[in-house]
Amino acid sequence: MQVIVALAALGSLAAPALGFSIPRGVPVSQSMIDVKLSSTGNSMVKATITNNGNRALNLLKFHTIMDSNPTRKVSIESEDGKEIQFTGMMPTYKEKDLKPSYFIFLPPKGTVEHSFDIARTHDLSRGGKFTLKAEGMVPIAEENGTEITGAAKYHSNELHMTIDGEKAASVENAFGIVKRGPLTRINKRTSIDMQSCGNNQELQALTAALKASAQLSSMSAQAVSQNQDKYMEYFKDPQYMQTVQSRFQAVAQESSSTTGGGTTYHCSDTMGGCEEGVLAYTLPSQNEVFNCPIYYSDLPPLSNECHAQDQATTTLHELTHNPAVQEPFCEDNGYGYERATALSAEKAVQNADSYALFANGKLNLITLMLIDPD
């Protein structure tokens, strides 16, 4: 299936821009990219990405079919139409200062292939017939550049596979069962794995981020019904107001619960998921959240810039990925302000960054800084 590619000049951003943000008003060109899925083994899948256009493209790998991390690249349904549980990671990437190594260069008419084993991130031990498909959006930079100037939406073909369950079960899962140290409920909120906190500074930063996440989420829940223009900017359709409000309330509860939360939060990476560029990640199948070193070194506790990344809203973002907070848990359908606000209402209400960006809006930031300047 073909993909619509959007390109724009570098200086044409009409709103605060992040590394993954897609400029507003971007002109839509002809279909230029093709994504095809094929089976190359029992549970092995090959994605073939072809540039059908006449200009070279630099494609960002993060949160796409080309991501080298064990992220959700395809949706998988069994023969009876049930979705197969995803057991991989949902990372939050740093959106600024993107490196050339984060991109794949695709010359005109060029093709790149990316293979992955779906048994590493899904339980396929029952075996049988499955249907796979992939869809998403690839941020694009100009040739030899790293500043995002456009995006390509993609919808792959449907791939039908018959999988041997015993062989699939023999594939090592990308993440085993998380081993925790002693757990402590700081102010009776989400459990913090104390053994993962290498120093007191990390624990203090995480505790402060959870406090800010609770406050921002609580204020956002109120803003959903009090500021309809702001709500519509991010979530598009009034019919989802109650869903959005209840999710913010659930995140606020999880961040500062008086009855005990359902997630475990780790100050540091104990599962090996902190690859380059990852700020934090969640294992939704286990309700576990992990911070990475650059969460502490590269993010402020709370940004005074609207729609910028910080520790508080990164933590809020991660908590929306956990089914113990609210089901169905949020996906990564659109990253950054421009991509998030371009989603359909159905996609936005299930998009983690839509909640983080809404909470990080100017009104909430000013209010939080006034009531909690420290």
Curated annotation (Swiss-Prot):
Organism: Trichophyton verrucosum (strain HKI 0517)
One Pfam family cited in the UniProt record for this chain: Peptidase_M35
Name by which UniProt lists this protein: Probable neutral protease 2 homolog TRV_05367
Keywords linked to the UniProt accession: Cleavage on pair of basic residues, Disulfide bond, Hydrolase, Metal-binding, Metalloprotease, Protease, Secreted, Signal, Virulence, Zinc, Zymogen
Function: Probable secreted metalloprotease that shows high activities on basic nuclear substrates such as histone and protamine. May be involved in virulence.
Enzyme Commission number, as recorded: 3.4.24.39
Propeptide positions: 20-189
Catalytic class of the enzyme: hydrolase
Binding sites annotated in the UniProt record for Zn(2+): 317, 321, 332
Localization (cell): Secreted
InterPro entries xrefs: Fungal_M35_metalloproteases, MetalloPept_cat_dom_sf, Peptidase_M35
